[in-house]
Every structure is written in C-alpha cells, then in structure tokens.
From Swiss-Prot:
Belongs to the peptidase T1A family. It is found in: Cytoplasm; Nucleus. The modification Phosphoserine is found at S13, S75, S173. It holds the Pfam family Proteasome_A_N. Residues 240-261 are annotated as: Disordered. The lineage of its organism: Eukaryota, Metazoa, Chordata, Craniata, Vertebrata. This is Proteasome subunit alpha type-4. GO terms for cellular component: nucleus; P-body; proteasome core complex; proteasome core complex, alpha-subunit complex. The keyword Acetylation applies. InterPro entries: Ntn_hydrolases_N (IPR029055), Proteasome_alpha (IPR050115), Proteasome_alpha-type (IPR023332), Proteasome_asu_N (IPR000426), Proteasome_bsu_CS (IPR016050), Proteasome_sua/b (IPR001353).
Amino acid sequence: MSRRYDSRTTIFSPEGRLYQVEYAMEAIGHAGTCLGILANDGVLLAAERRNIHKLLDEVFFSEKIYKLNEDMACSVAGITSDANVLTNELRLIAQRYLLQYQEPIPCEQLVTALCDIKQAYTQFGGKRPFGVSLLYIGWDKHYGFQLYQSDPNGNYGGWKATCIGNNSAAAVSMLKQDYKEGEMTLKSALALAIKVLNKTMDVSKLSAEKVEIATLTRENGKTVIRVLKQKEVEQLIKKHEEEEAKAEREKKEKEQKEKDK
C-alpha cells in the first residue's frame, strides 16, 4: 500500500503520513546508542562507538561526539555523512551569531535554527530528509545547563535524560527509573550512563574502546567540554562491574538467609 506514497518526500498517504520521514526515523533506530543526562553540576553525552579499528588515530577521530562552539557539543545517531553536514551547519550558525551580536548563541536558538533546515527538507521536492537525530548539550546565561534532542522531521525538545539510536526505548525506561531529579551529580550521571549502556548495547561485555563519553561543566566562569580518555572510561566500567558484583552477592546472601529461615 505504502509504495504509491513513498517515492517522494512531499506526498501524504491517505492516513496523513509522510513515509520518507518515517523511514529516516527507522535509519536512526539501527544506529549506535547515544544518551544524554542532565545533572546539577554539568551535563554529559555517552555514545556507542561502532567503528573501532586499532589503526584509527584517536586525536583526530570522534565518531559520535562533536564540539560546536565554546558552550555546546552534540552527539549523533544515524547516517554519519548527513551528520557531518549538519554539524558543520551548526558551527556556522553559531559563529555567525557570535560575529553579529558579540555574544555566544543561546542553546535553544541554535537547535531551532537547525530544526528549521531539517523541517524544510521534509517539504522540498526531489530532496530526502536528513537521516540523523542529534542530542545537544550546552550552557548559556539564560537557562544554565541544557539537553536537547532533535529528529529528522524537525521536531525538538528539552530533556533531563534521553536516548536515541538502537534499543533507545529500553534505555529511556531505565533512565526514567533511575534518574533522581534534583539529586543528580555529574559523578552519579556518569555511573548511570555506564549502567544503561551496559544493559542496552548489543555486546556481551562493555569495553572502553566501544564507548565515547563527553562532559560539559563550568569552571572559573568558563564552559569546559571534555571527552573522557579511554583509561577514565575503563575505570568507570570497572567501578560499575564491582558494584554489580557486590549487588549480586548481597542478593544471594539475602536469598540464602530467607531459605535458612
């Protein structure tokens, strides 16, 4: 049935659906997991890295996380070549604003500007939508730390914690369960990110080379964006495994005590 209505982006089906936009969303569902968590003292992005090759140079290579300006970074899920075009556009928009107004662009304004472009590509004839969802983290003087998500159709929203990519529904339900509003520090957010990735990634054992993590904090009145080194990620994974083992032991001991009763 859909074949008659999905050859062009601009044709509505009788149910009022745009199939090409839905297919773009489908591409994101097969991409590596990306999640963002907002804490009181910062905000983080954690992403699954699929393209791991021992000959890749880490200094120049970041598969999932991009710095946009001094106050913002983003993570992508979907077609990487589309993501490169959009991140370049984001950087241009941010620099134009800085040149024009002599102050950094507010986070939401940058997200809105890109979403206008994404939405236009769902209307133009002969063009396809961008097959990319983005998570944005940032800080501005108006609203402090912020986390946004945008989709191929041009929709966006502000979040406290969210996930895009493969197994995102399972990840979001875990975040909903474990996110403690008003109590989240960056340290506890990092632990939660590792816990969620460990449960949702399609690997038997989580390893540091398959995970990319970036944090955004404020120090001495300046925004600091850091991509964690592999050793730091290894330590986080090790700590998580120790806590899991401890919880498992306590559970077994509790069960044993109940049996003995």
